Regions:
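Active-site metal-binding loops of divalent metal-dependent hydrolases
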Residues: 1-5, 34-35, 93-94, 117-120, ...
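Short active-site oxyanion
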Residues: 48-54, 112-113
Length: 184
């Protein structure tokens, strides 16, 4: 919902969708991995009720508070919380520049998934069976920054660590259109 713009402005980077993604009424929890604009997307967050439960890294807290959200739970890597019948464990994620979060999420029957959007696998995670891994499967580089998504590099390690039934690809671009200097 709404364009994605990275500071300092649209001339630098802008992502747009032709069709808005509708937000379902029955969503009762939000899980944020990072406080960056493409993860903690203000136009999308404005569509939610202010009392929705949000699990996030510290980098997202100030943004969420400014938007008026009232049920914010900050998790640091290795911390766990039980929420809405789920056990949510934060794992160390991408250093952009501070360490952000990945998550292991399991229901009461032990079914669940692992997610980390930049292809960083926390070396402290012990091998375990998990149903699905949500991860990029490609590497992405930025001029003057270098590799910031390491999906192709981490995928074999994720499969070895979690032995997932499913790998769900993220960070592929989808139907988005990108403009700006960063996209050149």
């Amino acid at each position: 919902t709404g364009d994605l713009v990275f500071p300092p402005g649209e001339w630098f980077f802008k992502g747009s969708l032709d069709n808005e993604i509708l937000i379902e009424e029955d969503i009762n929890i939000i899980l944020l991995t990072q406080g960056l604009p493409d993860h903690c997307h203000v136009p999308s967050l404005k569509k939610f009720k202010k009392n929705i439960d949000i699990i996030c890294p510290n980098s997202a807290k100030v943004i969420l508070e400014k938007l008026g959200f009232t049920s914010i739970k900050v998790l640091k890597p290795s911390e766990k919380i039980k929420e809405k019948g789920l056990e949510i464990e934060a794992t160390a994620g991408a250093p952009v520049p501070q360490i952000e979060n990945g998550y292991i999420v399991k229901d009461e029957k032990g079914k669940g998934f692992y997610i980390e959007p930049h292809g960083y696998l926390d070396e402290n995670i012990k091998s375990q069976e998990i149903d699905a891994v949500i991860t990029p499967i490609i590497n992405l580089d930025l001029p003057m920054v270098g590799s910031f998504v390491k999906g192709a590099d981490v995928l074999p390690k994720l499969i070895n660590t979690f032995n997932p039934k499913y790998v769900l690809s993220s960070t592929a671009g989808g139907e988005a259109k990108y403009t700006g200097l960063l996209n050149k």
